[in-house]
Amino acid sequence: PLLDPATTTPEPSPKHTPARGFDAVAEAVLGDDPREADGVEPGPLAGPVARINEAVRAGRIDTAAGLAEQTVTDASAALGADHPEVLRLRELAAYIAYLAGDPVRAFHVSLDVARAHRHAGDTEAAYGNVQSAATAWRAVREPVQGLNLGNELLGLWTTLATEGGPAAEDPTALDSARSRMQRLAERAAVVR
């Protein structure tokens, strides 16, 4: 035979990539009602989150946005802004802002949540929120604003990539964002 099976290294099995960013949030919104999870005690935000999800599923994005903002305010006051459930709620609020056509707000909320997760040492969640911020950033059409937001995004993204974890394992996404920055710089130069 051409290859001796005893001396060849088997191909590593492909690594499962979890849903990240707004994809993960969308899966949660479209998934089961958090109040009805089998064997799991619903958290204190299960009821409000279920109502927000119902509004999103029904296409009532303005209602969902209002509910999310009020719930974030109330939950932050009760639990603290960096409590895990509040962070998940803020991820949901960012997704709703994106659906509502407010990519700048979605960007800022996602990046703030990414920073909180990084500070807590959760690189997977931090990178997921960087991905959400990147999705929102790509929806910003004004080149100068896109450059400003992109600088902020790439700063955190590069830091996460140098620290290892999922951001380091996905260099093509970061390279793609850097390429977009080049295109934005070219467009901004024409606009000025």
List the predicted regions and their residue ranges.
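Low-complexity, proline/glycine-enriched flexible segments
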Residues: 1-44
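Alpha-helical segment of the N-proximal tetratricopeptide repeat
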Residues: 38-77
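TPR repeat positional signature
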Residues: 48-51, 68, 90-93, 110, ...
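Residue at a conserved register position within TPR or TPR-like alpha-solenoid repeats
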Residues: 55, 90, 97, 117, ...
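Amphipathic alpha-helical segments of tetratricopeptide repeats
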Residues: 72-77, 111-118, 134-135, 154-159
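Helix N-cap/loop-to-helix boundary motif
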Residues: 80-84, 123-124, 164-171
